[in-house]
Amino acid sequence: MTFEAMFAKVKELLSGADVSGIGEHLAYQFNITGEAQGIFYVEVKDGLLHVEPYSYNDCDAAFTCSAETLFKIASGQSDPVGAVFLGKLKVEGNIDKALKLKSLLPSES
């Protein structure tokens, strides 16, 4: 899978996220490893969600993982905290803000 295909899928998965209740600015950078290697960011600002295929200088938290791990997290099949403990997701930066990523993700069915 190419980075472009992976990014389009992630953007679609996050498109339904309700960020209206998030009253603070959140900025996350995702560093994707493996076949779909690349960088993109997710930002919540002024009640709007932005997902763009660029790096984000001065982000609150940076996540590094494979596309497979990212899809499992973004679709609600895997818990991001659990992925960190399993070594599948690396997190750098503000951990308190990183934990708020869960509020953007679908709940597990």
Question: Where in the sequence are the language-model features?
Answer:
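Feature captures hydrophobic
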Residues: 1-109
